[in-house]
Amino acid sequence: MAIFRNALSRSLPELDTGPQGQPILVQNKESPEGWAPKLTESSPITKVYKRRWIIVTLFCLYSMSNAYQWIHLNIIANIITKYYNASLPEDRFQRETTVDWLSMIYMLAYIPLIFPSTFLLNKKGLRVCALAGAFLNALGAWLKVACISPDRFAILMFAQTVCAIAQIFILGLPAKIAAVWFGPNEVSTATSLGVFGNQVGVAIGFLVPPILVPNSDSLDQIGDDLSIMFYAGAGYMTLLFILVIIIFKERPPHPPSKAQMLALQNVHEEHYGRSLLNLFKNVGFDILTITYGVNTGCYYAISTLLNPIILDYFPGHEESAGQIGLTIVIAGVGGSIAAGIWLDRTRTYKGTTLGIYFLSMAGMVAFTFTLDLSLLWVVFLCAGALGFFMTGYLPVGFEFAAEITYPESEGTSSGLLNASAQFFGIILTIGCRAMINKVGTLGSNILISGTLLLGTICTGFIAADYRRQEAGKEILDQMDNVMQIEISEKESEKSRIAEPRSRDNQI
């Protein structure tokens, strides 16, 4: 607790002495961006603005478009392999793994670039990162338009790499947007909405490509279908970039919560490298980084390899593979929102994290052993349960990290969580692809189930150290003390004024 008090004392307004030597709070002249606490006459101004819903909606839309570009090629991996076969390796494993890299490049690009992008987020703020992400997202989409030829897989990979760089400026923003724009009882819900946009994009990426680009023996027909898909995507993402330029703002005129006001001051005072060091010294956050990476990495591996997993049991069902992916994501959207609302009401971060992790593992086991039944409706049901809990874990992990690492920047902690997810996503995708080719799909699914079991066990060792909640309680206590002092002083002053009058009346 002493650590939290020291952090608060550095970021609270200065104390001065008022009448009768009592301490009163005065304005901190060095507070940035006009968010200085003014407690000499009243409480600090905190306010939520209606614009916050426009900001989070716009973020959801362009996050959705980037997530769509992540998976829209791999859900039709067999068709992409057929069309670009002339520019792919001859060896089967290398050829399939090369196509898998259209998804894994998102994971690979994130790992080395997360640190400079997080530094940019902390130094330049939300608007700069939003502009960078939206611009690169649109640029990558237009580059794909130039890839319509069987010998241009290298250009397609380059375009996908540009989109992968764009997501670096997107994935770390939900918790930051929630903290900067939303009130204390809306933070978890807002974070869930931020993740919601990303998941809707994945859902569209699963559903639409198998419909727009059906399997065909004619390469010309496949090329025409790909062209329609790429042009439509490029136009939509260009519109979003223009909207971000016009609408997206850095922060509201006043902070939405007292905790955010204090956190903002600390971000300006603390060095980014020192913030990273503080996070790495936090054992609970270290464990959470690994377990979050494992859970989300499993989700990435399943999403990337869903096409071969489903086609192994249901040949020729490309559209069913996309619909199963859609089911996973839609159920996950419900899970994300439900988890956010649950956290806002209960604040039971560790218990919720552990419970969802265990249920994710149970859902994966059910999915694994129902594929053999050859009943698509059962597969859809189990996929929905898997998605509800596995995707519902994403915002819970962000918020748990923000709680146990306060007052460090939410952008930094969520960025490290995402970097871990990308790392484990690459390892698990390559490992599962090798298992599919050498052992079979069952072995691949068992590998993911076992990995989730290990992650569940490790999650139990994370301490429930809710620093953000404690900080909020302490600042409210200090404000109550200040208000009591001011009330006491006013009553004393009234008494001193009233005494001479009563004497005059007696005379």
Predicted ranges, named:
Residues 157-197:
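Cytoplasmic helix-loop-helix junction between adjacent transmembrane helices
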Residues 2-68, 73:
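Cytosolic juxtamembrane N-terminal segment immediately preceding the first transmembrane helix
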Residues 347-397:
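C-terminal transmembrane helical hairpin of 12-TM major facilitator-type secondary transporters
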Residues 73-74, 282-334, 394, 428:
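Extracytoplasmic gate region of multi-pass secondary transporters
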Residues 112-126, 335-348, 436:
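Helix-to-loop junctions at the C-terminal end of transmembrane segments
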Residues 186-214, 237, 418-428:
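Glycine-rich segments within core transmembrane alpha-helices of 12-TM secondary carriers
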